[in-house]
Amino acid sequence: MSTISKEYGGALFLAAKEEDNASDGYLKQVFDAVMLCSRLFKENPLYVSFLKTPDIPLEDRLAAVHDALNGRVPEYVDNFIELLTERGYIDRFSECADEFKLLYYAENGIAEAEVVSAVPLTDGEVHALRTKLKKITGKRIELLFEIDPSVIGGLIVRVDGRVIDASVRKDLDNLRELMGKTAH
């Protein structure tokens, strides 16, 4: 992550947090809007290209942003997009959003867990996993799922800098390694 993204994402977080002290819930509103805009920019890279195009006058680009957002995001997010556009950093919005998310999660005792499995988990398995990870980390858990058939069975979980590999693939790799050592 670039220094610019850390500075801008951090500044937005601090400003929203300060405003949250005055109006309860504002930080959460800003977080939700930043995540939404980040997802929109990732899914529609033409938006970012449009906002970066120097051939279109800045006023027209900003007017288009204001029209598109039309009061649907908190003022701080609208102003943040405007600032990044004016300074030519709008292509770093997603990185800024990542920094904002890190700070928001730290502030609210949330850990993000990446879960890799061969097949989708059932609701019961998701609940049990979330409960177990909460017990391990002491934090509220946000789960991100990835399906990878090469896992074969079980799970690989990355949370708080730790990797928990309880996959069948790992067991087979360990067995293969053990068999290779005993064959020599």
Residue ranges and their predicted role:
Residues 1-184:
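Elongated, mostly alpha-helical coiled-coil "stalk/stator" tethers of large membrane protein machines
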